[in-house]
């Protein structure tokens, strides 16, 4: 992986309006990739096919398409081409400008109006790591808070480019550390705070409606952009992503979603297999990390006593989590989030496949499933005319651990 060549062909390169003065120093606007094994979508492929790209969009795909006269042709010599993968969870910092607003919620941890795309605080190293795995697009979430704000979508260029400003509201159950006197200071307090904020939002929107209908009989309502943003997100059935650390947090997320009629998504913990029956009614969309627990060190005598039966059982079952969720009929995507070593990502994908989940399902969890959930199914996740030319070129099959990524196109 370290020796693989990463090529970024941004649509920004195609947007220049100045006259071309030296052809050899200007990137071509039209490309044709020939002689490739093209994985157009999970389960579908074209052997010996070609892809024509114009201005950052796929113009044609097929086995017998003609190379446009103005195209720069590249012979891929049988390399495999996949639609660019979608990283379902990437975090960025808080937009500090939003903290200056006088119309915000009294608690700085409640910022549903905050948008992740307004503060692209992402290290270049992190972007390069994701591209080295084949990711070309990311679902970007705010990093801090209880009501963290709105996620968005970016292309993983050297200078990330937002392509959708608002996807979902993000909720975290994390409470403030002990020793701090600010509310909330316990899990019980966080849950109460989340519920009260939803009730406050309901009250705020209803009060606005009453004032609009009877302005002469009521005092004007103080503007609160936080409660308004939260209410509007619910009104348009925007997804609410709950960050979980085990199966009990997932249950809490489902309970809150049922109480307030939310469209729930769950950033998983890897323990979902323990409560499959609990998700059957609401059918949330799962964003699943694959940072499996490391092998317990039980070589030395008595060292096995430091591990509980539950820990040993989870170590054994964790790679099966996606298999169980798929068999239960749940939709999910895969994320590299939480992985300390991104180089383990493809190895862990192979573990999932070895445990029985098909390559097509795994590929769909990296492409078509997140694209559909994010509302980008007409431009991302497939290799087809009209789609963004976000591509991953591999010298063999992606799920073959010996294969190397040759280039990434964005």
Range-by-range predicted roles:
Residues 27, 98, 102-106, 111-113, ...:
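His/Asp/Glu-enriched, well-ordered alpha-helical/loop segment
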Residues 36, 51, 56, 78, ...:
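Divalent metal-coordination and catalytic microenvironments
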Residues 48, 213-316, 333, 372-374, ...:
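Active-site core of metal-dependent hydrolases
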Residues 36-39, 47, 372, 384, ...:
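C-terminal cap of metal-dependent C-N hydrolases
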Residues 3-13:
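Sec-dependent N-terminal signal peptides
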Residues 131-268:
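Polyanionic/metal-chelating signatures
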């Amino acid at each position: 992986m370290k020796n693989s060549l990463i090529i970024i062909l941004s649509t920004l390169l195609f947007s220049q309006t100045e006259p071309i003065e030296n052809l050899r120093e200007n990137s071509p606007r039209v490309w044709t990739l020939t002689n490739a094994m093209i994985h157009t979508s999970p389960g579908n492929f074209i052997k010996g096919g070609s892809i024509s790209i114009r201005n950052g969009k796929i113009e044609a795909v097929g086995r017998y398409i003609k190379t446009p006269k103005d195209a720069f042709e590249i012979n891929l010599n049988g390399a495999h081409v996949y639609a660019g993968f979608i990283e379902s969870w990437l975090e960025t910092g808080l937009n500090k400008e939003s903290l200056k607003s006088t119309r915000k919620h009294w608690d700085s941890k409640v910022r549903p109006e905050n948008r992740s795309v307004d503060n692209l605080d992402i290290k270049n190293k992190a972007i390069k790591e994701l591209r080295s795995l084949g990711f070309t697009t990311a679902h970007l979430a705010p990093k801090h808070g209880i009501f963290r704000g709105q996620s968005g979508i970016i292309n993983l260029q050297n200078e990330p480019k937002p392509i959708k400003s608002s996807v979902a509201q993000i909720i975290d159950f994390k409470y403030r550390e002990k020793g701090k006197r600010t509310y909330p200071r316990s899990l019980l307090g966080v849950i109460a705070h989340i519920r009260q904020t939803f009730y406050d939002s309901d009250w705020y929107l209803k009060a606005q409606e009453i004032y609009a209908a009877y302005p002469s009989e009521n005092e004007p309502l103080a503007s609160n952009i936080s409660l308004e943003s939260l209410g509007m997100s619910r009104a348009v059935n925007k997804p609410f992503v709950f960050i979980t650390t085990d199966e009990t947090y997932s249950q809490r997320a489902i309970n809150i979603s049922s109480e307030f009629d939310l469209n729930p998504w769950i950033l998983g913990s890897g323990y979902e297999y323990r409560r499959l029956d609990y998700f059957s009614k609401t059918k949330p969309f799962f964003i699943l990390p694959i940072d499996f627990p490391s092998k317990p060190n039980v070589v030395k005598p008595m060292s096995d006593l430091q591990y509980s039966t539950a820990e040993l059982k989870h170590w054994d079952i964790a790679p099966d989590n996606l298999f169980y969720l798929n068999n239960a009929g749940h939709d999910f995507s895969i994320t590299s989030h939480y992985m300390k070593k991104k180089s383990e990502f493809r190895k862990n994908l192979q573990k999932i496949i070895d445990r029985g989940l098909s390559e097509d399902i795994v590929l769909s969890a990296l492409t078509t499933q997140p694209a559909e959930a994010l509302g980008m199914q007409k431009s991302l996740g497939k290799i087809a005319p009209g789609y963004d030319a976000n591509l991953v070129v591999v010298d063999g099959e992606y799920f073959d651990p010996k294969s190397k990524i040759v280039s990434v196109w964005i």
